[in-house]
Each structure stands twice: as structure tokens, then as C-alpha cells.
């Protein structure tokens, strides 16, 4: 019996160290940044067995086999469609402002398209008004409505949007709705799913969370995009989930979520449509390529000099594209750089770029929420403050709710707006979308909004920050160790 137990112990011990060696090898060959690799290695060494389990759940970036196979196939189809889109020369804006030239050249070289013209582009900040405008657009739709959201929470104004969609589907409008399985769990447990499907709306649960699948694909890769497309002509994107801000996470005591959305008319809906079609095909296997734009889309154009690029990220999409775009935008700044983000856990490269911008004379401001829905991210963010403040960066903490907007403004000319947070999850894992907008009028509007955020914020004092309690510094360091994994 003793021999049997010794054999079992020897087998467990050998298996454990083989797993440790295998994971160590996989971490090292990935060529990721050193803090990220060190965090994983320390996790699996310091926390036996649990660390290995965490790695298998969250360490490797991959989709399920079926989705991965579809993702590889659709790019050949998408590339053919993009080649046809290039023949629509009337939609492209070839020239860009000086500050935007580098980032648009990056997008052109990697994505194959010049910036897209827009007929009309508008910034929206009031959630109630956004919902009202959206409902109006839904009722005016003539052909199709396509949506993707991370969170759809039933109740309040979200139900008004649901009713508008159902009414539109009943009058023959082709409606598609794709929602993240984890973010919209309350929606998928509600009667709305069956009601919508009975009315003719195609509802898809993206990246479905299933305990039987946790060993087949990474469970924390999420569909974080927020896109609304109507009639291949109107496009919405930004930070807003489909929730009523008066009801969403009301019990948390952090106040209303403050969001930012863009509403654009014109051929940009087509390029956003190809992203939506890729996501839809990955989930369903069905092709829904958008129609090519026509010249009528740009009649009576109000933003004649505006140029827009759409950048998408996620498994199967261009690697590091959003990260490269953010770095390019920051290094392009000459006078002023304003960053708004709810989560500030930047990569080493982004942190260095932001600090360098301040040190070469650019006025750099970062606006983050004072109140947070994530204790982990809140403390992980604080460890970067000292380095940023030392470089001359101004850090503002927004006091009137949870600032959920994600935006970057460079020299009041180049704007980046979308779903991307400055954290590892947005930069490397999730399905995200960012609009890169080269337009001075739009930039001035965004500047006014960001200034309003600043007026409702408190500035962190460098001297006071350096005198914070010692236990807080220790806690920050602990979460800094975890920051590459957040």
C-alpha cells in the first residue's frame, strides 16, 4: 500500500512540475513585455495549483475551434470585399492634417484603406437624448438595423429601445442584435429574448459562457464593441452600453455613468459594417457583407474636410493595431494631449509615450473617475500616478459619477473615440472598436466636453500625493504586480 501511495505522490509531483515547465516555456516564447511575463511566472510559482488553473483559464488568448476556423476563413472574403470598396474612390479623403498624417498612414498601410469621408458627424453626451435620437432613427429605418453591445440591461429607457426594435421588425425591417454573453447575462435571463425572436429579430449570444467550454477557449475574452448600424448609412459608436444610467448599478453608490457616443452619417457605416459582419460570421457562420456605398451618401456634405478611420481589435483581427494607433497619436502631439479613460492600467510603452509627451513640452491631462466600479483596477491605476506626476502630467479625478467615456484628443484636431480602455484587457484581449477622426470642428467639440469633465474634477496635487500613507503604497505595489493580468 505504501508503494502505491508513493507512486501516486510521485506521479502528481512529476505532473505538476511538467505543467510548470510547460507553462514557463509558453510564457517565455510569447515575447510579451517583461512585467506581463514576470506576473504570470510569479503567479504559477507562488500559488501552487491555483496559479496553474488561472493560467489555463486566462493565460492563453484563443477562441473555440469552430470560431477560430471561421475567423481564418472570413478574412479572405473580407479582403476581396475591401478590394471592391477601393473602387469607390469618391468616399476616400486622401489628405489629412499634419497631426493626423502619421496615424492615418499607419491605418492605410495596415488596413489597406484611406480615411473615409462623412456627410455629418455629431458628438452625443446626454444618455437620455442619445436614446431618444436612437429610437427616432430606429423608427425611421427603411431596410436594416444591426447592433452589438457588451451590456444590455433591461429596464427604463433600454426597454423603450427594445420596443422600437420589435415594432420595426414587425413592419419588415431586418434587425440583428448581438450581445456579449457575460455582460448581458440579465438580458438573456429575461423574457425580452423570446419576445424579440418571435417578432423576427435575430438575437445572438456572443462568446457564450458555458462551464463545459472553459477548457476549450479563454472565458475572459469579451465582445466589448458598441456599434449601431442603420440602413448602411447611419452609424453609432462610443462608450455607452444599452442601459438606463438612472438604473444601472444604482446600488453601488458611485452615481450615474457618464458616456460619450458619436453619430455619423455616410459611408463610414459601410466600413463599420464589415467589422459587424465579421463578428456575426464568427458567431453564426453566416455571411452578411454590407452593400457598397453610393455617391448619394455624400450629397450636401457638412463635414467636407473630416476624415475617419475605423480600427477593430480582437482575436482574428490585426494584431496590436489599436495599441500602435494609440502610441502614434500620443507621439504626434505637439501642443496638447487630453486622455479620458475609466481604467488606467497602461502598457509600459503607453506609459513611456505619455510621460515623454509631457517631458517634451506637451500639455498632458488625464481624466479618470474618482469613484470606481472595480476596486482592483482603482488600486492598480494609482501605482502609475507618481511616474506620471513626476513627468509633468496633470491627473484629474472626475467627481460627478463614474466617467465611462474613452477619448483621446491631440492638439484639438485628432480625436480617438470608442470602446478601448487604457488597460491590458482592452489593448490585448477584447473585441474593441476605435474611431480615429481628423476634423477641427469635431476636435473643438470634444475639447469643450473634456473641459467640462475637468471642471467637475479635482486635480491631484503632486506634493500631497507623495505624502500618502505607507499602507496605500504597499497596496498599490501589490496591485501593480497584478496589473498585467487585469
Swiss-Prot record:
GO biological process, one term: cardiolipin biosynthetic process
Assigned GO CC terms: plasma membrane
Keywords: Cell inner membrane, Cell membrane, Lipid biosynthesis, Lipid metabolism, Membrane, Phospholipid biosynthesis, Phospholipid metabolism, Repeat, Transferase, Transmembrane, Transmembrane helix
SUPFAM superfamilies per UniProt: Phospholipase D/nuclease
Superkingdom field: Bacteria
GO molecular function: cardiolipin synthase activity
Reaction catalysed by this enzyme: 2 a 1,2-diacyl-sn-glycero-3-phospho-(1'-sn-glycerol) = a cardiolipin + glycerol
Keyword Transmembrane belongs to the record: yes
InterPro entries given in the database record: Cardiolipin_synthase, CL_synthase_A, CLS_N, PLD-like_dom, PLipase_D/transphosphatidylase
List of catalytic residues: 224, 226, 231, 404, 406, 411
Keyword Transcription regulation listed: no
Enzyme class: transferase
Bilayer topology annotation: Multi-pass membrane protein
Transmembrane segments: 3-23, 38-58
Pfam families, alphabetized: PLDc_2, PLDc_N
Compartmental location: Cell inner membrane
Domain PLD phosphodiesterase: 219-246, 399-426
Enzyme Commission number, as recorded: 2.7.8.-
Family, similarity comment: Belongs to the phospholipase D family. Cardiolipin synthase subfamily. ClsA sub-subfamily.
Role this protein plays: Catalyzes the reversible phosphatidyl group transfer from one phosphatidylglycerol molecule to another to form cardiolipin (CL) (diphosphatidylglycerol) and glycerol.
PANTHER family registered for this protein in UniProt: CARDIOLIPIN SYNTHASE, PHOSPHOLIPASE D
Protein name listed in UniProt: Cardiolipin synthase A
Lineage: Bacteria, Pseudomonadati, Pseudomonadota, Gammaproteobacteria, Enterobacterales
